[in-house]
Amino acid sequence: MNRINQAADATEDTLRLSIDAKATVKIGPFSRGGKSRIQVAAADHDFAPEATVTPVGIFLPTLAELFIYGVTSHVTSDCLVDCLAQWWETVRARFSHITTLVVNLDNGPENHSRRTQFMQRLVDFVRHYRVTVRLAYYPPYHSKYNPIERCWGILENHWNGTLLDSIDAVLAFARTMTWQGRHPVVHLVTATYETGVKLTKDAMQQIETQLQRLPALGKWFVDIMVPV
């Protein structure tokens, strides 16, 4: 993993990013620990939240840039790739020289390399945007080394001791956190995502012909090349 990351960071036409979803935030007057300068009354149980928001983050380690998408639906394979596509639409003019995206991610249930819908959506992404995607997964119990995890710790400390009693409050705290002196770009995602979407075995076999898996480590390192 270190070799792949270092090679990506040293290659002019390659951009490395880290993607992950934070734990879902329950909206309501709930205690979240931490301290506040003012007295805040909070419920000590978080039953029946008014809504939920799951922050999905895309972090550029070499540029210290963070993008957060507040998702109000399920974080599915489709959701993750939609966030990736929305991010790329907003930045690709800046990165017109980039031909490869190296993506650091953990081996979660919605984004592992055997997740059929995730892989199909990434193949579609590569075909549409004409940019190669290299997936570099952290193995089990090592997701804490995924660079974006450090950002989630900062965000958690930033809003601890406060009441996240509305979606707007969650987004406002996300916008005012800082990473190396910079605020993240924050968007709200209100699309509805269905769970359990998957391909048939035959359809996935066709997708596999468009993937290049590293021998002996095919679950952890996958290239999706731009078709000729």
PLM features: residue spans?
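Charge-mixed, compositionally biased segments that are often intrinsically disordered regulatory tracts
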Residues: 1-41
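Short, flexible loop/turn elements at secondary-structure junctions
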Residues: 5, 21-25, 60-62, 107-109, ...
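Extended hydrophobic secondary-structure segments that form protein cores and membrane-embedded regions
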Residues: 17-18, 100-107, 135-140, 173-174
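Electropositive, glycine- and tryptophan-enriched low-complexity nucleic-acid-binding patches
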Residues: 41-104, 109
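C-terminal accessory extensions appended to soluble enzyme cores
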Residues: 93, 161-228
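Acidic, metal-coordinating catalytic cores used for nucleic-acid/nucleotide bond scission
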Residues: 105-118, 139-145
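Two-metal-ion acidic nuclease core segments, chiefly of the RNase H-like superfamily
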Residues: 118-136
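RNase H-like two-metal-ion nuclease catalytic core shared by retroviral integrases
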Residues: 135-157
